[in-house]
Amino acid sequence: MSITMRQKDLRPAPALIEYKGMKFLITDRPSDITINHYIMELKKNNVNTVVRVCEPSYNTDELETQGITVKDLAFEDGTFPPQQVVDEWFEVLKDKYQQNPEACVAVHCVAGLGRAPVLVALALIELGLKYEAAVEMIRDKRRGAINAKQLSFLEKYKPKARLKHKNGHKNSCSVQ
């Protein structure tokens, strides 16, 4: 077995998180070598947007050729997002879910255990979950996700009705 294959086998599977009609796919970072496999996984989950919260390390041309938008919202590993990243995250969700309510938004950091799950947890909290339930939902599918510093941030986070269903349509959302 090659080293590359062993490393690939150790990677956690993408975690699909669904709540109130919104879908998020938490993944680890692809590479230029694994990008085609990554695109297949994204297509399988109806992803039209990838939010990259780590430093760029792969070429996004192939994703964009496939109609998948890449948005960079990098912030420091092991920490929680600054307010500007939080605001931009909710703008991305608003734009994408208004354009295509059935679509899934993928979000990744390096391992898919810290920064990416924190952004998804923020969305779940805005959709009405308590922080404990949001973290539990993510950890059920992404074991080891969210460190103590990030957990403390989520505990203190106050939802601001940024994601709210409109017209009773379960898949529509708006950012306020």
Curated annotation (Swiss-Prot):
Coiled coil: none annotated. Residues 174-176 form a propeptide. CDD domains: PTP-IVa. One of its GO terms (molecular function) is protein tyrosine phosphatase activity. It comes from the Eukaryota. Keywords: Cell membrane, Cell projection, Cytoplasm, Hydrolase, Lipoprotein, Membrane, Methylation, Prenylation, Protein phosphatase. One of its GO terms (cellular component) is axon. This is PRL-1 phosphatase. The gene is PRL-1.
